[in-house]
Amino acid sequence: MENYKMNADDELLKNLDKLHTTKLGVERIKRNLFLDTDDVVGWCKAKINSVKAVITRSGKNWYVNIDNCIITVNAYSYTIITAHREKK
């Protein structure tokens, strides 16, 4: 039996090609997650598309919890706002 994500996730997953961020967003995400890649959007897309990703929506934002990271995406513009390590 295949594992399907909940319908709430479908909107974000169907629109991964629209995912983008700003120059400042790239810098912020790299700093917050200690990333050593310039393809921050590609990195985020891969994380969001993972079967382990837990995607929730609260108001205007999607929150993706994966590998002790939280990625925040604007639900209307598909802009990656920020990403940070999950606080324990």
Question: What spans do the regions from the language model cover?
Answer:
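Ribonuclease/tRNase effector modules and their secretory precursors
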Residues: 1-88
